[in-house]
Amino acid sequence: NEKGKYVKIHCADKNCMFSLKTGRTIPVYLVDEEIYAKCPTVIISTVDKFARLPWSERVGLLFGRTDRYCSRCGHIAIGEKHAGRHNADVAAGLERAETVACKPFYPPELIIQDELHLITGPLGTIYGGYETVVEEMCCIEKNGKKIRPKYIVSTATIRNAGEQIKFLYGRNEFAQFPPSGFDTRDSFFIKEVPLPTENLVDASEEKISRMISDGKKPFRQYAGICASGQSVKTTLIRLYSIILQTALDIAKEPEYEDYIDPYYTLIGYFNSIRELGGAVRLLDDDIASRIRVVKNKYNSLEQRYLSFEGKKEITSRIPSWDIAQVLEKLAISYDKNKEKQGCYDVVIATNMIAVGMDVDRLGLMSVVGQPKQNSEYIQATSRVGRQHPGIFTVYNPYRPRDLSNYENFVGFHSQMYRYVEGTTTTPFAARARDRVLHALVVSLLRLQVETMADNGGASNINDISDEQIKDIL
């Protein structure tokens, strides 16, 4: 409702208490203006929204800075211009609305930041600057003492956490959970499991599940491939063709048809759009031709054909709504009773899948080239193999770094978290201040000084005392 400035969200289930017939709406708000008006208890956002701080006085509503409430428009920010009443609008179905005074409320007391390892480099530098404004707005005074908000940050791949927390949040003390511990073979994030000595081909599902719960079955297995004298494209063609054709051959065998699902969809991981673009052409031509060669070489009963619908990519070139559909379809399993499968054959992607792709059925991935950061390699390969192992890393023999990782393959993969690089964040460096300091000052002026909150409040800059400016700086 454009005039009413709200969006009603109902459940499609007629028996739900939030269905359309009950008149109740799901208390979830998706539009920025509605979030400002409703001031919900929990706010989920991305860090790029920090850029709105100096541009709108309504952002202050997220920190409890309200002094009026309109029955139609919701909370009104301190210093925001707003009419005292609204006349009824019969055409829009809106009743007369009054604006009444209200008290400000407490700002957020708990901030949860996920994927801390991604806040690094230029993003982390700008983020650290804006974080000073967010923390200042979340502080409350009690008995002459300033109480700051509590932060909970999570990540699975981090090094020098104390230094990064100091640069981002200005905190010298922090508690890390879980602690490092006393046994290097079990660090909570990764556990060293000895390979089983018995043959598990004929093991029952109950036995395998029991081994998983007891921590006796490896979840993820890595295989390194480095073909000297061959190009990476040639290696990739042969690897993809043998994996795809072998998956179909095994799926046609009655004794394995119930276990082939994790390996029927191949995830291809690439370090750049350029490398991925070359793989798209290979899938359309060379890999399809090579599959025919593999089929004839091993006398397979049936050839694996890669349809257009069975090949997808997850990159920045694809619209966001298409990516959501691809991720949803990735959960479709192999069905032994269907001749035409609904699951994907191949999905190729860049580091977009390193965060947020959680599909338990996936068990097979090919990583072309060692990523620049080891944390990216760990995050990307953890998207698959959560229940069933299988990751192939194709190294480029003509790149010294790839060759070094291949030669130290076992040592590296047995202690990957040891090789995670430290993050770099410098929010208070000279060049960083040049970029962001003016925005921070404007944000604090608009959010803390009532006469400067409105867009026209800049003309009141002479009314600011020297003490106020010193406090802000």
Specify the residue positions occupied by each region the protein language model found.
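Conserved segment of the helicase C-terminal RecA-like domain
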Residues: C343, Q379, R383-R418
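Conserved helicase ATPase motor motifs in RecA-like P-loop NTPase domains
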Residues: E115-T125, V134-Q164, P179-S180
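A short beta-strand element within the Helicase C-terminal
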Residues: I353-G369, I391-V394
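Conserved two-lobed SF2 helicase motor
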Residues: T41-F50, K338-A354
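Conserved helicase ATPase core of P-loop NTP-dependent helicases/translocases
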Residues: I318-A349
